[in-house]
């Protein structure tokens, strides 16, 4: 019921659309933001780099440095190695969450945290809200590493083609904190045009709160290779993506992939936040678009 267009658009997102309509009068997208938005609308995915997207701030490099510090912690390496042993033995998930938040302790974020500063920046939120045409809620964040798998391993969990169940339209922002320049590094892969209103939207559709996992080989039989996009890039590559579209994570067979991810949904989503905002009294200093993004978690 929540995902029916009249309910989703006119009822559940009425307030967030009105707030955005008033706020966007003051928004001026840079040429890079405008290009990202255009690609996101056309294909459901847009790729840029922090050096051009955050050309006037250090937010991109701050989160890369913070990710590197976490990865260099001996406890992180111990956690990844333990997960690799478990996965090879029991076929558990192929991702290790280094900030918590997935069956673990929720990440505790405050305004000085580089992960939150990045996520709530006007650079990010202005693009996300422009695509969604409404204020959005910041629901989930994760810094995660893939584990190394033997070549030829069978796809499991997020390595399989799927559509996220969380909303009929949503945005995930991915930041590569390591080089992902070949298939062995586990590139993110997306079917261009599988987002809402896209040309491949009706192929293996999701009906929130239920996603979709196509049968093995099903996507390849229907979708031409030109529309199955692998996102390669150096450290600092930034991906905006509507993950209600068909997508999958990659196999890391030669090198682990370190990536930060942030999820933004509409007010229709029943997805609970996976982080804790530790200084809610400080939220008053944020712009309206950022206050709204964390308002469900204050």
What label would you give each PLM region?
Residues 2-43, 49-159:
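Non-heme Fe(II)-dependent double-stranded beta-helix
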Residues 134-137, 162-166, 177-186, 191-195:
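Active-site region of the double-stranded beta-helix
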Residues 166-182, 232-233, 240, 263-266:
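Short, conserved beta-strand element in jelly-roll/cupin
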Residues 181-246:
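Double-stranded beta-helix
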Residues 158, 168-172, 185, 228-230, ...:
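Extracellular structured ligand-interaction cores
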Residues 15-18, 22-26, 68-69, 200-205, ...:
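Non-heme Fe(II)/2-oxoglutarate
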Residues 139-140, 150, 154-159, 171-172, ...:
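A short secondary-structure junction signal
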């Amino acid at each position: 019921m929540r995902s029916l267009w009249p309910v989703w658009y006119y009822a559940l997102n009425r307030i967030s659309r009105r707030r955005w309509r008033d706020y966007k009068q003051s928004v001026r997208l840079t040429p890079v933001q405008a290009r990202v938005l255009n690609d996101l609308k056309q294909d459901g995915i847009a790729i840029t780099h922090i050096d051009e997207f955050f050309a006037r701030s250090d937010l991109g490099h701050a989160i890369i440095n913070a990710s590197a510090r976490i990865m260099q912690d001996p406890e992180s390496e111990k956690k990844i190695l333990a997960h690799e042993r478990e996965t090879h033995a029991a076929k558990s998930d192929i991702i290790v969450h280094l900030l918590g938040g997935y069956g673990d302790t929720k990440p505790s974020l405050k305004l000085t945290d580089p992960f939150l500063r990045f996520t709530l920046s006007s650079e990010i939120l202005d693009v996300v809200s422009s695509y969604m045409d409404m204020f959005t809620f910041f629901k989930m964040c994760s810094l995660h590493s893939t584990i190394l798998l033997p070549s030829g391993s069978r796809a499991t969990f997020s390595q399989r083609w799927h559509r996220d169940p969380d909303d009929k339209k949503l945005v995930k922002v991915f930041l590569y904190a390591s080089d992902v320049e070949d298939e062995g590094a586990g590139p993110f892969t997306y079917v261009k045009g599988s987002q809402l209103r896209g040309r491949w939207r009706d192929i293996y559709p999701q009906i929130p709160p239920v996603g979709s996992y196509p049968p093995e080989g099903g996507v390849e039989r229907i979708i031409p290779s030109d529309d199955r996009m692998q996102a390669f890039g150096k450290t600092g590559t930034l991906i905006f993506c509507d993950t209600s579209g068909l997508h999958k994570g990659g196999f890391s067979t030669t090198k682990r992939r370190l990536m930060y991810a942030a999820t933004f949904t509409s007010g229709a989503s029943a997805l609970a936040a996976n982080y804790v905002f530790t200084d809610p009294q400080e939220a008053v200093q944020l712009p309206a678009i950022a206050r709204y993004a964390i308002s469900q978690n204050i």
